[in-house]
């Protein structure tokens, strides 16, 4: 079954764990949801340069998710959104 992939574009596993807990109630609808941390990302995204630096590794991470039905970028400003749509 295809899954919804939520990508935390920073490298903070604790942030990803919080996101995973927040989306947990949505799993009751039967759609598998996987939350991933971008290990190559900065610890936090506080500038445009940091946001831009996440794009290439996020595209690689997304491409590796062969069962993804869709993606959510779990970050204010949606870094890489337009690149991920291509």
Residue ranges: model-predicted function:
Residues 55-86:
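Glycine/small-residue-rich loop that forms an oxyanion/phosphate-binding "nest" at active or ligand-binding sites
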Residues 1-57:
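N-terminal glycine-rich anion-binding loop in soluble enzyme alpha/beta folds
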């Amino acid at each position: 079954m295809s899954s919804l992939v939520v990508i935390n574009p920073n490298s903070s596993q604790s942030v990803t764990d919080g996101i995973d807990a927040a989306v947990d109630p949505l799993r009751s609808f039967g759609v598998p949801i996987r939350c991933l941390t971008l290990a190559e990302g900065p610890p936090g995204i506080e500038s445009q340069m940091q946001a831009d630096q996440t794009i290439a590794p996020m595209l690689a991470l997304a491409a590796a998710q062969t069962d993804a039905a869709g993606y959510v970028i779990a970050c204010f400003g949606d870094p890489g959104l337009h690149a991920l749509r291509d």
